[in-house]
């Protein structure tokens, strides 16, 4: 193994409008082809739509949506003696956030509303109320881990 030092995690600068690191990370997840300004417009428009529909703080709704989508366990493939087992493993906090954001964006992209901002707003509202495609994805992952609990002793 190389004897180089371990590279530390980069610090994410907070977004310019709300000064939130979580929102800055979410903007980076939505961004495609390096078009950050477009991603920012989509997120800020979605947050405005959420603010119109709900009287609560829109950042708290985003936080609630991500809380309801974050997985606590997932399954990883592990090969033992010629057969592959789906082994349930606990998810690290950084990965929980990353998976929640990714699933929320994927679910929003599959929705039928006219613009991406409306799709994202709809999915955030659904997820904050514990329904929607992203929450269903989390439930499926948890169900898969529960079904394979017998292989938990293969954890590494």
From Swiss-Prot:
GO molecular function, one term: rRNA binding
Organism, scientific name: Shewanella frigidimarina (strain NCIMB 400)
UniProt keyword annotation of Methyltransferase present: no
Keyword Ribonucleoprotein found: yes
Alphabetized Gene3D superfamilies for the sequence: Ribosomal protein S7 domain
Family designation: Belongs to the universal ribosomal protein uS7 family.
Subunit text: Part of the 30S ribosomal subunit. Contacts proteins S9 and S11.
Function: One of the primary rRNA binding proteins, it binds directly to 16S rRNA where it nucleates assembly of the head domain of the 30S subunit. Is located at the subunit interface close to the decoding center, probably blocks exit of the E-site tRNA.
Keywords: Ribonucleoprotein, Ribosomal protein, RNA-binding, rRNA-binding, tRNA-binding
One Pfam family in the UniProt entry: Ribosomal_S7
Record GO cellular component, one term: small ribosomal subunit
Official protein name in the record: Small ribosomal subunit protein uS7
GO biological process, one term: translation
């Amino acid at each position: 193994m190389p004897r180089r030092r371990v590279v530390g995690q980069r610090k994410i600068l907070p977004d310019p409008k709300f000064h939130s690191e979580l929102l800055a990370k979410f903007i980076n997840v939505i961004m495609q082809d390096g078009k950050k300004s477009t991603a920012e417009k989509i997120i800020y428009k979605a947050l405005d739509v959420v603010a119109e529909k709900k009287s609560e703080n829109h950042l708290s709704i985003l936080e609630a949506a991500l809380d309801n989508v974050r997985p606590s366990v997932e399954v990883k493939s592990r090969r033992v003696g010629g057969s592959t087992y789906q082994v349930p493993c606990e998810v690290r906090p950084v990965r929980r956030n990353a998976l929640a954001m990714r699933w929320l964006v994927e679910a929003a992209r599959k929705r039928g509303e006219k613009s991406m901002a409306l799709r994202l707003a709809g999915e955030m509202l659904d997820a904050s109320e514990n329904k929607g495609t992203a929450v269903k994805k989390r439930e499926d992952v948890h169900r898969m881990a529960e079904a394979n609990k017998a292989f938990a002793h293969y954890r590494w």
